[in-house]
Amino acid sequence: MQAFALSGKKRIVNHGMCFSKGNLDLGSRLSENFMDDPLIPGLPDDVAKQCLALVPRARFPSMGSVCKKWRFVVQSKEFITVRRLAGMLEEWLYVLTMNAGGKDNRWEVMDCLGQKLSSLPPMPGPAKTGFKVVVVDGKLLVIAGCCMINGSLVASADVYQYDTCLNSWSRLADLEVARYDFACAEVNGHVYVVGGHGVDGESLSSAEVYDPETCTWTFIESLRRPRWGCFASAFNGKLYVMGGRSNFTIGNSKLLDVYNTQCGSWHGSKNGLTMVTAHVEVGKKLFCIDWKNHRKMSVFNAEDETWEVVALPLSGSSRAGFQFGKLSGKLLLFSSQEETGQCTLLYDPDASPGTQWKTSEIKLSGSCVCSVTITA
């Protein structure tokens, strides 16, 4: 999502740690007495899991309140696998919207048809900018950022998780380094954060990885230069960082930093974009909008690191703001400025030329800040 550049003295938000039940050590969970009880009396647990997997996703919070063992199953990665094998996975779109005054925001939830389902409980913690959102194991993570507390700008290391199955928020382990305006993406079930601004507003080159199994953050090899205002995407098991600025460039950086998660090392090329205001991955391609012109989008093919340009069917100002979403393998284009009056557009990359753009019936209650798609 778009991050905001902030200046001035920063300090770390240091709240008390609070870990959710779903993040406790697996061994300790299995040792509890409730794990010895059958999921459904009279049925083997494997069969019972298949029965539970047939329940519509909207009923998961109710299932999780039946008993501790049902809650444990609904939260597990295995349950997603069982639902996939049963052909019961449902794709939902989560959109963070903001009202016209820019003071209140909320997450709206829509099903695979774009029908509005509900709103999420309010995000915990103070209102922040410069944070990032990412999805891992069917859960939504809101990471770090910067906020105003008692008149001071505060760089945060907080990480909050929304469990889409239980409709609840919990606190995860803090980042090793408080940061905002950084790059973030999920690669092979792990979450990576790179660069950004730190506690005193300094530019960062450090990078960290989060392991959901252990609920821990660990440093990885740093970038060769500090970088901020950037974004990240994942392709073929690699982390691609581009856009933003660097201490070693005049203006915006076109450098593309690529992290090989298998080798644990970085390499770079000069084939990235500069100031990207919106991006989304659909299939094996990355779609971006540059801040200079919102009437076209640049499409990145990670296989050969090449770009192509696709025109947007828009009129009016070329600086009108937009944010991306994706649903059912198609790209959604939301207005990030409520007053523009733009409708939601849908782009099908697999459709024949001339038929790729359509108007979507999806309507948001405010302007779009960011969005993610979660399948469970």
Swiss-Prot record:
Residue ranges of domain F-box in the record: 37-85
Protein's recorded name: F-box/kelch-repeat protein At1g67480
Superkingdom of the organism of origin: Eukaryota
Annotated keywords: Kelch repeat, Repeat
Pfam family, one: Kelch_KLHDC2_KLHL20_DRC7
Lineage of the organism: Eukaryota, Viridiplantae, Streptophyta, Embryophyta, Tracheophyta
Kelch repeat extents: 139-189, 190-237, 239-289, 291-335
CDD domains: F-box_AtAFR-like (cd22152)
InterPro entries for the chain: F-box-like_dom_sf, F-box_dom, Kelch-typ_b-propeller, Kelch_1
